[in-house]
């Protein structure tokens, strides 16, 4: 298996914290946003700052979401540029122990306490993709998550069966669920409501427009 970013870091980044408390640990956040991310993000297709000079990256917010198998983080990044402007990006994170690694989308090798493993993009973990699907199906609002899962009136599927990526990612990552539904994860985040979401929901739930893909849910 070819491990992306594996050659960049000869040794793992070592932290005293465990994964469940990583985003509350100042040392982890400091190293993650500088030494780890600055190298990783500039090589991603969805990164829109390639024409500018990166100054620094800051973790401005995050949420934690857990499944029966793992704990995941959704991280909001503020990327600041020397040209005096900034952009926001969303990055879902997972920690995989060495013996559990099943993806080549490695962000960096890390050691949390005595446990060695890898920091990876959570979207490449089927368990995380299933977790998103199940939460949309249940559509329960959880203030602790800082998230609202909404189930559209046209979404009648209740069971997760499969998920896969749709083509190469650009400004978003699209996931096909059950060979029937597409969830678009926007990597670059704007303050205003996303127009794709607004238009899709209005056409489906207000105008009952049948000549476009129906809105079935959102996060």
Segments (PLM) and residue ranges:
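Short Lys/Arg-enriched alpha/beta "domain-start" segment
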Residues: 10-54
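Conserved ATP-binding subdomain of kinase catalytic cores across diverse folds
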Residues: 61-219
């Amino acid at each position: 298996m070819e491990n992306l970013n594996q050659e960049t870091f000869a040794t793992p980044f070592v932290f005293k914290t465990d994964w469940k408390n990583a985003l509350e640990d100042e040392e982890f956040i400091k190293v993650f946003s500088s030494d780890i991310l600055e190298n990783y993000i500039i090589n991603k297709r969805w990164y829109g700052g390639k024409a500018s000079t990166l100054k620094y990256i800051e973790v401005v917010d995050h949420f934690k979401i857990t499944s029966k198998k793992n704990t995941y983080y959704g991280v909001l990044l503020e990327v600041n540029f020397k040209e005096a402007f900034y952009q926001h990006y969303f990055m879902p994170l997972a920690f995989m122990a060495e013996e559990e690694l099943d993806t080549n989308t490695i962000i960096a090798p890390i050691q949390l306490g005595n446990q060695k493993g890898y920091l990876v993009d959570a979207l490449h973990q089927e368990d995380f993709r299933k977790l998103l699907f199940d939460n949309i199906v249940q559509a329960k609002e959880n203030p602790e998550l800082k998230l609202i899962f909404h189930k559209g009136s046209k979404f009648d599927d209740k069971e997760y069966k499969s998920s896969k990526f749709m083509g190469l990612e650009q400004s978003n990552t699209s996931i096909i669920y059950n060979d029937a539904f597409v969830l678009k994860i926007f990597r670059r985040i704007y303050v205003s409501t996303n127009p794709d979401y607004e238009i899709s929901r209005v056409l489906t739930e207000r105008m009952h427009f049948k000549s476009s893909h129906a809105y079935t849910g959102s996060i």
